[in-house]
Design a protein with these regions (language model features):
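Glycine-rich, compositionally biased intrinsically disordered regions
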Residues: 1-36
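Interaction-surface and assembly-scaffold signal
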Residues: 40-185
Length: 185
């Protein structure tokens, strides 16, 4: 298991609506390699978040009025922080997971001639999706400037809603939508 923080945007490709992961940080190296194979632009980061407490007073409960927090750091810089307060149950976790993902798999060639080894546009959807408890609520989100990250370039313009949910998804393959023909050697 690992923690991740990601920014997903909606996009269209060849007339179809997709979700695209613009930024994603994970806290384990193995998650970076798998994600890059899938086309996610994963980077290593430090992610901290409140976990629900089911007994005792060691954290917030999954009930109206409880507040959860999360932070993202990378390269010894705070990049983002968030706070979510449960307002009530939700039927679903919004539209973030409602569309298939669209990714760009790109790897430069080992030569320094400007050629690429891989350049593809791919899509994928999970299977065996299981959604657990889901809550909607109020949230606050703040991004911070960094000399090496560009997260502030996608600052929110409109707040739609906040969600907290449990989800399990499996993945095994995707579909290549476009592949740039690479030069022969």
């Amino acid at each position: 298991q690992y923690k991740e923080m990601f920014i997903v945007i909606r996009c269209k490709y060849q007339g179809k609506t997709y979700s695209r992961c613009a930024f994603i940080w994970v806290d384990k190296e193995f998650a970076i390699i798998r994600g890059q194979h899938q086309g996610y632009p994963k980077k290593l980061g430090s992610i901290q978040m409140s976990r629900p407490a089911y007994v005792g007073k060691g954290g917030p409960r999954l009930e109206v009025g409880s507040t959860f927090g999360a932070t993202l750091g990378a390269w010894d810089r705070r990049l983002a922080e968030a706070k979510f307060t449960i307002a009530g149950d939700a039927e679903s976790p919004g539209f973030v997971n409602a569309h298939p993902m669209l990714h760009h798999r790109w790897y430069p060639a080992i030569e320094t001639n400007g050629q690429d080894s891989i350049e593809e546009i791919v899509t994928m959807s999970g299977y065996d999706v299981e959604i657990g408890r889901c809550f909607k609520g109020d949230f606050e989100l703040a991004y911070f400037d960094s000399p090496v990250e560009e997260l502030t370039s996608l600052a929110p313009k409109e707040i739609i809603n906040g969600y907290w949910h449990e989800v399990g998804v499996s993945w095994k393959s995707g579909t290549t939508l476009a592949r740039k023909t690479l030069p022969d050697f």
